[in-house]
UniProtKB/Swiss-Prot annotation:
A Pfam family annotated for this UniProt entry: DsrE
Organism: Shigella sonnei (strain Ss046)
Keyword Ribonucleoprotein applies: no
CC per GO annotation: sulfurtransferase complex
Localization per Swiss-Prot or TrEMBL: Cytoplasm
Name of the protein described by the UniProt record: Sulfurtransferase TusD
Its biological purpose: Part of a sulfur-relay system required for 2-thiolation of 5-methylaminomethyl-2-thiouridine (mnm(5)s(2)U) at tRNA wobble positions. Accepts sulfur from TusA and transfers it in turn to TusE.
Encoding gene per record: tusD
PANTHER family hit by this protein: PROTEIN YCHN (PTHR34874), SULFURTRANSFERASE TUSD (PTHR34874:SF3)
Enzyme Commission code(s) on record: 2.8.1.-
Catalytic center residues: 78 (cysteine persulfide intermediate)
Length: 128
């Protein structure tokens, strides 16, 4: 079965993102296809490369990045939600005159069209 995941919670502070990550791992272990993860609202904080968890905590931002690198899962970030929350890539930082970017490699700023496409092409869309 082909799945897409929508994450609306931040990397830390709620259970949404970590539950989504564990679900994503379980899908892959069980042989399902995870085509994409779409980060929306507070979920865009999962792509902030400046996140620095305590040494005894799982680094969820890098966990998502590894999921992308090892399994080719697209990590799409809602561009409007990201810009409102200060998560920007180099292109947007330059366009907006910001000093630097902070989008973790492996993540892509995209519009709601990426979510719509996932909804149309996947058997299931699961939101956390």
């Amino acid at each position: 079965m082909r799945f897409a995941i929508v994450v609306t919670g931040p990397a830390y502070g709620t259970q949404q993102a970590s539950s989504a990550f564990q679900f994503a791992q379980a899908l892959i272990v069980e042989g399902h296809e995870l085509s994409s993860v779409f980060f929306y609202r507070e979920g865009v904080y999962n792509a902030n490369q400046l996140t620095s968890p305590a040494s005894d905590e799982f680094d969820l931002v890098r966990g998502w990045q590894q999921l992308n690198a090892q399994h080719g899962v697209a990590l799409n970030i809602c561009v409007a939600a990201a810009l409102r929350r200060g998560v920007v890539d180099e292109t947007e930082a330059g366009r907006l005159g910001l000093a630097s970017s902070n989008l973790q490699p492996g993540f892509t700023l995209s519009g709601l069209g990426a979510l719509a496409e996932a909804s149309l092409t996947c058997d299931r869309v699961v939101q956390f």
